[in-house]
Curated annotation (Swiss-Prot):
One of its GO terms (cellular component) is plasma membrane. It is a multi-pass membrane protein. NCBIfam families: hyp_HI0043. Belongs to the UPF0283 family. Pfam families: DUF697. Keywords: Cell inner membrane, Cell membrane, Membrane, Transmembrane, Transmembrane helix. The chain crosses the membrane at residues 70-90, 99-119, 213-233. This is UPF0283 membrane protein CKO_01392. InterPro entries: DUF697 (IPR021147), UPF0283 (IPR006507). It comes from Citrobacter koseri (strain ATCC BAA-895 / CDC 4225-83 / SGSC4696). It is found in: Cell inner membrane.
Length: 353
């Protein structure tokens, strides 16, 4: 039997002709030049923004030097000396029945105890913030794991930290969807699809509300100093609410550390995205011609607040972003533009009447 005829293949583009490389003239190096020759180092670009952030963060992080260790050792020795001297004063006051000195020692002990307790609480909260980064790395490993037994316990721990009750509908759906034959990757993926969006939706609403308030405040208020104070207060409050939402209790130092990480991430990773998002609106809708200068400043402040909230959400979230579940700045941008336009239209309507 004869073979069937194959269909015709049409080539739309022209055939690529191999280009012969031209040979360069020979260069001869002397023995002295050959001995001192060193190849030039070519700077390789970073693979992604995350690697660039890690390099910058490592460069800005203070290194543990010998002087710092000496200072910490001196402070520890001073603390032990204060405690020992206080015990000796207490014993002497008890033996001599000096009740005034004994009361002073008791008051000092209470103050020192309160200070130690405060330091311990701050350290625990700071440790909890650092532990969230380790949990995110653990979740990333589980999402690439084919083992079994660890995913369910890990997700139950995350639900407990976030304050999600066992009777919550989302958690009940997750329990009904998992079974023993699923591996850790499937269990964690189901948790990210069924339970985690509940917290993410609340965080998105907080970001949207804060961004809208910042936008309207800047667009209406005539005082720049009041605007700056209001925006700073709202941004700090937004970070606190997002951290509390994801089960992280912030202290003084942990709040400063989180705020520093958020600003560092925005400065070195989000500038290009922010410029791109704002530029798309300005070019496509010609907002500079339609809105006043104060309204444009309000939209810019609202976008910065939204960017701040997104980065705080990313740092406090126990799971890495999966697929396209990361909130985009463009979603908040369109909402802010609509709110500013409605506010301007409402302000013009009474004047016309």
């Amino acid at each position: 039997m004869s073979e069937p005829l194959k269909p015709r293949i049409d080539f739309a583009g022209p055939l690529e002709v191999e280009q012969n490389q031209t040979l360069k003239t020979q260069q001869t190096f002397s023995e002295t030049q050959a001995q001192t020759f060193a190849p030039a180092q070519v700077d390789e670009p970073l693979e992604d923004e995350g690697q660039a952030e890690a390099v910058i963060d490592a460069a800005l992080r203070p290194k543990r030097s010998l002087w710092r260790k000496m200072v910490m050792g001196g402070l520890a020795l001073f603390g032990v000396s204060v405690v020992g001297q206080g015990v000796q004063w207490t014993m002497n006051a008890w033996q001599t029945q000096d009740w005034v000195a004994l009361g002073g020692c008791a008051a000092g002990a209470l103050i020192i105890g309160a200070g130690v307790g405060s330091v311990a609480t701050e350290w625990r909260r700071l440790w909890r913030l650092r532990q969230r980064a380790h949990e995110r790395d653990e979740a990333r490993d589980l999402l690439h794991s084919h083992g079994t037994g660890k995913g369910r316990a890990f997700c139950e721990k995350l639900a407990q930290q976030a304050g999600i009750d066992q009777s919550h509908p989302a958690l009940q759906r997750w329990y009904a969807s998992i079974h023993e034959t699923q591996n850790d990757r499937e269990v964690v993926s189901l948790y990210a699809q069924l339970v985690q969006p509940v917290l993410d939706a609340q965080a998105r609403r907080e970001i949207s509300r804060s961004a809208a308030e910042s936008t309207l405040m800047i667009a209406v208020s005539p005082l720049a100093l009041v605007d700056m104070a209001f925006i700073a207060w709202r941004n700090l409050r937004l970070i606190n609410r997002i951290a509390t939402l994801y089960g992280i209790e912030l202290g003084y130092y942990s709040r400063l550390r989180l705020f520093r990480l958020v600003l560092l991430n925005i400065a070195f990773a989000g500038a290009s995205e922010l410029v791109r998002e704002v530029g798309m609106d300005w070019m496509s809708q010609d907002l500079a011609a339609r809105l006043s200068a104060r309204a444009a400043q309000g939209i810019g402040a609202g976008l910065l607040t939204a960017r701040l909230g997104i980065k705080a959400m990313e740092l406090c979230r126990p799971l890495p972003w999966i697929d396209d579940d990361k909130p985009r700045l463009g979603d908040f941008r369109r909402q802010l533009i609509v709110q500013v336009k409605e506010t301007l239209q409402k302000s013009k309507t009474p004047r016309e009447n």
